[in-house]
Amino acid sequence: MPKSEIRKLLQEIKKQVDNPGNSSTTEIKKMASEAGIDEQTAEEIYHLLTEFYQAVEEHGGIEKYMHSNISWLKIELELLSACYQIAILEDMKVLDISEMLSLNDLRIFPKTPSQLQNTYYKLKKELIQVEDIPKNKPGRKRKTQKNTKKEKTNIFGKVVPAEFKAPASIKEQISYDKSREKNLVDLLSGVKSNVQLLSENQGEENNVYDLLKSIYSLSSLAVQKEELDKKYQDLQTKCQELEQENSYLKQQNETMTDSFHTLVLQVADFAYASDLDQIQALPLFSQQLVVTLNQLGVFKENYKQM
């Protein structure tokens, strides 16, 4: 089933939840049946979405819920799992599903595509349970810490030492361990320090310029690589489509060749038969000839225009 059909079904479910009526489930089942989806699955999503919106109202409405200390409601996670499953069964990609369900499109969930996608994978890998998840509660359980003293961490989750000795000079500051270069913050800090060091020396403006120019050139190359990768993927997709089309045309050509060969044999058998055999075989020959001509795309309605 095309992606558009899944989208239309979910859009209709949301519409019926927003404006409930006596025939809501009937309309949803009808649309699901026409699209080839299990009616019970569609009805289940309808009830889950209804319960989710009711739970949101109990928390004071969508705005208060989004700014509350609740990251995910249990019913919301159940709905999330059901929506992904129904779309994945119809060969939709997780990325497209996340975009469709998010605030960017159908607005079924008050979440961004990345929030939906990350949570779906956590559910799939059983990193989180189907339960109410507070914002201050991580998906994985933390080990019990004997030391109750709060430790400072950077944005990468690494512990920062409580006591930090300021470097005596800029040269000391940029002499950090190369094994830490994978840390983006350290890299940017090192670049900044190098620029400051070069700027301290008089007459080194060209060195600063060359450094920044090199950084710009490298970043430009990275952007170009992303664009080339995308073009390469597009070309691969196009190549696959052409290969499929070529395979189809090849198969059609083989079929046409076989049909033409059959037609020649039928005409030859009839032409070289005796007069008596021709008279007796004429009705069967005519029927066989029509079948073979149809296989070649020649019909009574179009043969005069060919």
From Swiss-Prot:
The keyword Glycoprotein does not apply. GO terms for biological process: negative regulation of DNA-templated transcription. InterPro entries: MogR_DNA-bd (IPR021009), MogR_DNA-bd_sf (IPR038245). It holds the Pfam family MogR_DNAbind. It is found in: Cytoplasm. It comes from the Bacteria. GO terms for cellular component: cytoplasm; protein-DNA complex. Its main location: cytoplasm. One of its GO terms (molecular function) is transcription cis-regulatory region binding. Gene3D superfamilies: Motility repressor MogR, DNA-binding domain. Keywords: Cytoplasm, DNA-binding, Repressor, Transcription, Transcription regulation, Virulence. Transcriptional repressor of flagellar motility genes, such as flaA, during extracellular growth at 37 degrees Celsius and during intracellular infection. Binds directly to the gene promoter region and probably prevents RNA polymerase binding. At low temperatures, MogR repression activity is modulated by the DegU response regulator in an unknown mechanism. Required for full virulence. This is Motility gene repressor MogR.
